Amino acid sequence: MATAASNPYSILSSSSLVHADSAGMQQGSPFRNPQKLLQSDYLQGVPSNGHPLGHHWVTSLSDGGPWSSTLATSPLDQPDVKPGREDLQLGAIIHHRSPHVAHHSPHTNHPNAWGASPAPNSSITNSGQPLNVYSQPGFTVSGMLEHGGLTPPPAAASTQSLHPVLREPPDHGELGSHHCQDHSDEETPTSDELEQFAKQFKQRRIKLGFTQADVGLALGTLYGNVFSQTTICRFEALQLSFKNMCKLKPLLNKWLEEADSSTGSPTSIDKIAAQGRKRKKRTSIEVSVKGVLETHFLKCPKPAAQEISSLADSLQLEKEVVRVWFCNRRQKEKRMTPPGDQQPHEVYSHTVKTDASCHDL
C-alpha cells in the first residue's frame, strides 16, 4: 500500500490492470468516460480502486500518461485538449447545478472510451456539429434527445409537421402572371407607338385650334379627370413616365375622335373651350415663316405699320400676329444683349438715317 500510495502512476500504467478492470467497468455504472470520471471523483472524493486519487487523475491525464495515448484520436480528428484545474472547478459548479448539461469532450464518442453509449446518446449530429450534452447513468438524456427536440428533425418531417396554412404553397402564380403579362402586352403600347401618337396628337390639336389648356379642361369635363396644361405639354414632349403615358393615351385618343367628329358644328368641346380661359388662342408659326421674319428683323427691328401689313399679306398671316412677333423679338433681343452694348435697331438707326419705313409704331 505504501508503494501504491507513493507512486500512483504505476497503477495507471499497468496494462494488465487496465484490461482487467475494463470489463468490470463496462458492466458497472460508476465508471463513465474519462472526463466525467475525473469530474465526479475529483468533486466527491470517492475512491475508485481503494486509493483517493482525485488530484492524481488530473495530473496523470494532463501529463500525457498511457490512457491519454489511447484517447488521443477522435472521429473528427480534432486536437486533444485536456481541461485544466480551473476548467474542472468550473465544471464542478455546472455539474452540481444541472446534471444533464456539461462541457463537451471530444473523447465522448471514441470507441475506446469507457461507458461509450450507442447512437441514441451520441453527442455529435449528422452534420458534424457537437452538442454540449453527454449521457450519465441515472441521468439519461436519450429521451430528451429523441423527444425533447435537441436533435433537429429532418427537413421532410418539419415540413409535414407544419400547419397546412403555414406551408409554402406551390408557386402557381408564375403561370398566371405570365399569362396576364402576355395579355397586357397586347394592349400596352410600345414607346415608339406612344411617340408617334404624341406627335400626331400635337399636330391635330394645333390644326383644330385648341390649346393645351383647352384639352385638359375638356378631359376633366368629359371623363372626370382634370389635367393641367403642364400635363398635356409634358405628354406631347414625352416627358411623362411610361405608365402615365399609357394611361393618358386612350383619353386623348377619345378627345381627338370627339374633336374630329364635331368639326364645323358647335359641340360640347367648343362650349367647353369657350367656358375656359378667356384669352386668344396661341398662334404657332412655321419654321419657314420664322426665317422670313428674322430676316426682316435684322434689316429693320421696328417696321412701320404699312410694312407690317405688306409682310402679313405676303406670309398669309394676320397683321396683329406680325406686330406682336416683332414686339416679342425686340424684348428677346434686350434680354440677350448685355447692358452697355448697342442693340440692332440702334445700329441701324445710325447707318440708315433717311429710311422712313423704320420708325416706332
From Swiss-Prot:
SMART domains according to UniProt: HOX (SM00389), POU (SM00352)
One of the Pfam families matching this protein, by short name: Pou
Entry's family note: Belongs to the POU transcription factor family. Class-3 subfamily.
Domain POU-specific: 186-260
DNA-binding segment(s): 278-337
Regions of compositional bias (Basic and acidic residues) in chain numbering: 165-183, 343-361
PROSITE patterns tied to this protein: HOMEOBOX_1, HOMEOBOX_2, POU_1, POU_2, POU_3
Any single Gene Ontology cellular-component annotation: nucleoplasm
Keywords assigned: DNA-binding, Homeobox, Nucleus, Phosphoprotein, Transcription, Transcription regulation
One of the record's GO molecular function terms: DNA-binding transcription factor activity, RNA polymerase II-specific
Primary site of residence: nucleus
Any single GO BP term: cochlea morphogenesis
Protein name: POU domain, class 3, transcription factor 4
Species whose genome carries this gene: Mesocricetus auratus (Golden hamster)
The protein's role, per its UniProt record: Probable transcription factor which exert its primary action widely during early neural development and in a very limited set of neurons in the mature brain.
Cellular localization per UniProt: Nucleus
Residue numbers carrying Phosphoserine: 265
Region Disordered: start-end pairs: 99-131, 144-192, 334-361
Compositionally biased spans, kind Polar residues: 119-131
